[in-house]
Amino acid sequence: MGNKTTGDIDRNSFDFLSIIGKGGFGKVWRVRYKQNCQEFAMKEMSKAKIIEKNSVSSILGERDILAQIHHPFIINMIFSFQDEDNLYLVTNLFTGGDLRYHMNKEQSFSENETKFFMGCLILGLEVLHTNNIIHRDIKPENLVLDYKGYLKITDFGIAKKQEKQNSNETSGTPGYMAPEVMNFQNHTVAVDYFAMGVICYELMMGVRPYVGESRNEIKEKILARQIVIKSHEIPSGWSKDAADFINNLIQRKPSSRLGFKGINQIKQHKWFNHFSWKDLYNMRIESPYIPSYEDNFDSNYCEREDNISQQEQELLNKIKSSEQYKTIFKNFLFFNMYDERSNSQKTFINPHKKYEEKQAYSSPQKLKSTIPQLSDEAKETNKFNLFSPRNNKIKHHI
C-alpha cells in the first residue's frame, strides 16, 4: 500500500484501532489522531475501484460538499487526503448507529422522540438548503445518532447544488424519493421535505406510506392516490398536529408541500409550537432517546475477507497504469474549511449563527492550533459504530 501524500497529513498520522464498516470501495476504520488522541471515523477507499465503478463524481461531490459545510447536525469532515492507492476521508465518529437500525430494533417511537429527531433533521436540512444543496437521499440509513441521541445527516454521495434544470437527476431511494424526481421533473429542496415526511410517517405508523417491490410499483402507487393519515388512524399517544405535519410534508404536488415556500413554514408549523430551536442548536434539549451500544455492531461482518477475481485484479491494475488515475483526484486534500492549504470554497453560510452562544458549537479553528481535545464520546467503551453492518448499513460509495 502506498503511503505518499501531499501536505502535512497522511495515513501515518493515525493509529488504526478497528474496522467498523466495509463496502465496495474499501473499509471504514475507527482511528485515533496521534497529535491529540482524538478519535474519528476514516473511510479508506481504493482509487482504482472508484474509477472502475464510475463513482468518481459521487466521491468528489461528497468531498466538495463536506469541505464547504460545518454544522452540529451533519457529519463533518476533518481531513481528506490520498496516497498512491487510496483516498482517505476522516469525519466525526458517531457511536449511536443509524436510525434504520433503531427503527428495526424498537419497532415504534413516541411522538416526543420523533419530534426531537425531526427537529435535528430540520436544522441539518436548513443549513444545507441555505447553502443551495439538495441532499436527495434522506432516509433512515443516512441519519446517524451520536452517543447522546442527537441525529446527524450523513452520506452526501448524490447531493447536488440546486439548479433550475435538473430533471435528468433521478438518483435516490424508492419509497423516500419525491414524485417529481420519479417523474423526471425539475425539482427543488422540497424533495428533501417529502423524504422527511415519509420518515416521520414511518416513525408514527410503523410502515412507509408508499411500499412496493420495485421503483415502478412505488411510482404507480404514488400516482394512484394521495396518502392521508385520518383522525381515526392516529396511534394512541400521538396528536392531530403530528398527523397534520406529516400529511403536509408528503403532498405529491411540490407547491402544496409544507416547506415549498421556505423551511420557516416547517419550523413554524403548530406541531413545533413552543419548541426552542435555539436550545436544540445549542444542545440544551436532552434527547428522549438514548442509543444503546450493546448490539449495534457486528464485528464478524467486518472481519470477512474481500474476494477479488483475477480478472477484476487485472482490470484494477490496468486502471492504475492509466493517465486518468494519476490526475483525477489531484484536488482531494483537505485540512479544514478555514485552513489555507485546503482546496475548498470558503462561502459557508450558517443560518443558525444567531443561535450561537458562548462555548456553544463553533466553527473549527486552524488545524495548527489543534482539534479539540478528546471528547467524552471518544472516552466511551470500545462499542463504536459509524454504520450498522448488521442492517446493511454500509455506504454504497465507500
Model-derived features: positions:
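Activation segment signature within eukaryotic-like protein kinase domains
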Residues: 117-118
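Conserved N-lobe beta3->alphaC-helix segment of eukaryotic protein kinase catalytic domains
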Residues: 39, 44-70
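Conserved short submotifs of the Hanks-type protein kinase catalytic core
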Residues: 85-98, 102
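C-terminal regulatory tails of eukaryotic serine/threonine kinases
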Residues: 260-352
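A short, aromatic-enriched beta-strand patch in the conserved N-lobe beta-sheet
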Residues: 79-80
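Protein kinase glycine-rich loop
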Residues: 17-28
